[in-house]
């Protein structure tokens, strides 16, 4: 133990929680596409300032998630589909058509914004909050910074411990 450096504390939230999010929440695909098309088209993706800002895409996607959520509330639930179905359609569309990097990025933005636009089911939110409370209690600190990451199959096993296939968010 190095003074001032905390040993890592790990908490796993089961992938079942993510599947619950995908299967129990719904999005309005038309609203997602409309908002993403409009806002994505306003960005000059070749602008050096945008390409040099490591936080731009994350902030952009979060903003889109909020806009989609508000627009979907105003629209109602008449044409909502399961989040999983929407994502599968977006991914399948990419897999079956030749697209460049810009279209791939746009599809990625669409999927991320759709996920961020839905309300997290209560049991999933409670599992995350409970894991965080446990870490804070162990550290005797009510605001412990944490890294949040998703792991793909095969990551972090005894034979293969690596990060990088999925996203990691530090100091959450």
What are these model-derived regions, one by one?
Residues 1-172:
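N-terminal beta-alpha lobe that positions the nucleotide/phosphoryl donor
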């Amino acid at each position: 133990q190095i003074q001032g450096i905390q040993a890592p504390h790990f908490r796993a939230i089961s992938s079942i929680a993510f599947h619950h999010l995908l299967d129990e929440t719904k999005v309005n695909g038309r609203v997602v596409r409309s908002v993403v098309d409009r806002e994505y088209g306003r960005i000059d993706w070749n602008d050096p300032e945008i390409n040099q800002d490591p936080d731009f895409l994350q902030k952009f996607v979060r903003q889109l998630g909020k806009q989609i959520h508000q627009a979907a509330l105003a629209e109602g639930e008449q044409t909502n589909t399961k989040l999983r179905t929407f994502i599968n359609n977006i991914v399948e569309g990419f897999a079956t058509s030749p697209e460049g990097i810009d279209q791939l990025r746009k599809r990625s933005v669409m999927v991320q914004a759709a996920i961020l636009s839905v309300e997290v089911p209560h049991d999933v939110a409670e599992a995350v909050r409970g894991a965080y409370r446990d870490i804070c209690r162990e550290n005797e600190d009510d605001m412990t910074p944490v890294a949040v990451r998703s792991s793909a199959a095969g990551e972090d096993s005894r034979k293969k411990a690596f990060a990088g296939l999925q996203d990691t968010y530090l100091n959450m």
